Amino acid sequence: MEKEESTNKNNENIQSENEINKIDNKSNTENPTIKCIFKKPNKQRNIRKRSDDLILNTSNNADEEDEDGNEEKDKKKLKSKINQYTTKQDKKNEFSYDSSGNAGSSINSAELSSTQYMNEEEEFKKEVVLSSSRNNNNNNNNNNNNNNDNISNSEGSGGSDNNDDGIYRGMKSYSTFVEKKSDLTYKGGGVKAGPMKTSTTFKLSNRIDHQPDVCKDYKQTGQCTFGDACKFLHDRSDYKSGWQIDKEYEEEQKQKRLNNINGIKNNNNDNKNNDDDKEQQQFPFACFICKKQYVDPVQTKCKHFFCEDCALTHNRKNKKCALCGEPTLGTFITPPKKILDQLMEISKSHFKNQS
C-alpha cells in the first residue's frame, strides 16, 4: 500500500511540472510584455552627509550633558532638608496627634533616617580631610627632623663611615662641616621665626670714606657763579681724602721694608727739613711784574707768585705767565696759608733790610 501511494505522488508531481513548462513555453512564444522597475527614492537624499568627527563630537557632548544632568540630580537628592518652621500652620501640618493624644511629627521615619545619614556622611568627610592634612603636616615635620638628625649624626661621626660605603643616600646625607643651631629656621615645618641666620662661609667688611662735597670752582678760582645758593662747600683749604692717606702710608711702609732689607737707615726727618729749607730759599722776595712787596699774592699753575692786581692786568694783555711763558688759562690760585705766611715773611724781611 505504501509503495502505491508513493508512486501516485510522484506521478502527480511530474504532471504539475509538465503543465508549468507548457505555460512557460506559451509565454515565450507570445509577445513579451515590458516591465519597468523603479527604485524607491531615498527620503534623505537632499541632506548633506556629516563627517565622522562631527558625529563623534556631538555624541561626546550629549554624553557630557547626560552626565551633568545626572550629577545635578544627585546633588539635588543629596541636599538635606532644613527643619525650619516660620508659621503656625506649617507646624500644624508637620505635627499630628496620635490616638493616645501624644504629639508626633508627620515626617516619615525614612526621611529622617536619610537626612541624618547625609549629615553624618558630610561630617565624616570633613573629619577625613582634616585628619589627612594633619597627618601630612606631621609627616613633613618628622621627615625634616629625621633628616636633620641624620645630618647631625653624620657630622658627629665625621661622615667617613657613611660615605665610604659607596651607596648613594640622597643629597641630604652629604657630610656638612658647618654646625647648625637648633633654631626654628631649621626644624620648623615651613615656619621661620625671626631673622635669617647669616652665612658662616664668608664674611664681608665695608669701609666708607665720608668726605664733604667741596665746590671745585671755588677751590680752584675762589669764585662761584651760584654764590650763596651753591649747595657745595666753599672751602679752599688743602686736605687729603682717606684713600690718599692710606696710599701714602702703605708706600712709606713699603719703603721702610726695602730700606731695612738693603741696610739703609731711615733719614726721612732730615730729608724733610732739607726740603723745607730749599722751598724757603726758592720763594721770591718781590713780585716779578711790579718789583715790590707782595700784595694779596696769587700762584699760577706753573707755581710762580705775583700780586693779584699785577696778574689780572697782565692777563688782560697776555694769557701767558710773565716768567716762563706757559698759558695760565686765566686761572690764579691763592696759595695755602702756610706758604702765604712764609712768602710774606721773606718779602717783608727783605724790604726792611733795604730800608
Curated annotation (Swiss-Prot):
The keyword Zinc applies. It holds the Pfam family zf-CCCH. Keywords: Metal-binding, Zinc, Zinc-finger. InterPro entries: CWC24-like, Znf_CCCH, Znf_CCCH_sf, Znf_RING, Znf_RING/FYVE/PHD, Znf_RING_CS. Residues 37-48 have a biased composition (Basic residues). Residues 1-167, 258-277 are annotated as: Disordered. Disulfide bonds: none annotated. A zinc finger (RING-type) spans 287-325. Residues 62-71 have a biased composition (Acidic residues). This is RING finger protein 113 homolog. It comes from Dictyostelium discoideum. The lineage of its organism: Eukaryota, Amoebozoa, Evosea, Eumycetozoa, Dictyostelia. The gene is rnf113.
